[in-house]
From Swiss-Prot:
It comes from the Archaea. Keywords: Protease inhibitor, Serine protease inhibitor. Transmembrane segments: none annotated. One of its GO terms (molecular function) is serine-type endopeptidase inhibitor activity. The record marks V328, C329 as: Reactive bond. The lineage of its organism: Archaea, Thermoproteota, Thermoprotei, Thermoproteales, Thermoproteaceae. This is Uncharacterized serpin-like protein PAE0049. It comes from Pyrobaculum aerophilum (strain ATCC 51768 / DSM 7523 / JCM 9630 / CIP 104966 / NBRC 100827 / IM2). InterPro entries: Serpin_CS, Serpin_dom, Serpin_fam, Serpin_sf, Serpin_sf_1, Serpin_sf_2.
Amino acid sequence: MRPLPSQLPIPLSPEGYGRFAVEFYKRVAVGILGENLVLSPYSVYKAFAMAYAGASGATREELKAVFGFGEDPCVLPAASRGVEEALSAWLQTDFPFKPNYLNKLRCIGAEAKYVDFERDYKSAIAAINKWAEEKTRGLIKDLVPADYPEGWDVRAVLVSALYFKGNWWPDRFQRVGKREFKGAGPADFIALDLSSCGDPSLRGRASSDLTVVELPFNNTEVALYIIMPRDLPSFVKELTYEKLREIISTLPDQVIRVEMPLFKAEFKGSVKQALREMGVVRAFETADFTEMAYRRLYIDDVFHGAYLNADENGVVAAAATAVVFKPVCAKGGGVEVVVDKPFLFVLADRTSGVIYFIGHVVNPSPGFTPT
């Protein structure tokens, strides 16, 4: 992936991106807390940044409120070192997109690609899916599903992709065999022992109510946070960005050993309903994207795919989001951490707090694929 232009950090206020990231996770997670899940709010945010650049009036204010965008659509975050991102806008060849919108896409760092949805819909969608698959190293396939209604009326698809691969710091974990994981039975566990005098300690704490550990990676400020509450569903229900930020920013350096399972989490599907519940309504109905094109458009659907795999070497994570537009006229300290029960995980920048991936694990064993 090519680097995006130099951009300003996300404003991590409760009203900004951080609030969106946690609320988006909660909206999707509420119905599937009985299975593993990972999402990338950051990928969704970046895809909608391209939509925000073309929005006007009440639609613009709606997106601004939900996602925490600033006044200037070109002022966006650049990903942390080690996190690769790419943006593309797939546009109908003969549709009247405004030159100023194309300029905004360039300043955001998005590549405009022209396809013919009307005359060769299948080839256009195949090209979009191939691009997303390539940018995510083959981890996100068929982003726009094959059963998505075929039709000539698609006019634009805005796509963001994200990829991360990190090796554990200060050392790789070791496999330690099977351990019992609450609610799921035996699972393959890995351990990191830092009990020697010359070893650094990790940030974290352990108690019967809440166990938290920060797992850093080499050559990046991104870290994986494992957050194991007494009861995961209750914890997720009450979770806020402010609470999450407080938990991960006040950890002492006292963890000398970590045991946790190998785990994998995935997601692929539409997130339109979750976004509607968060307040994105006009964009899906009486939309005003008059800064985007000379003809009226609305968002028909939003497809999201995410993947995260953790093993003894580190973490591989990828995500992609596609926002599909159609014309309105066609609308239809000596602490040991043992992670042995359902937990929340967050892949985030340790300094800025930017959340790249967030999810939970209730069964670490099914379908595990080593990196």
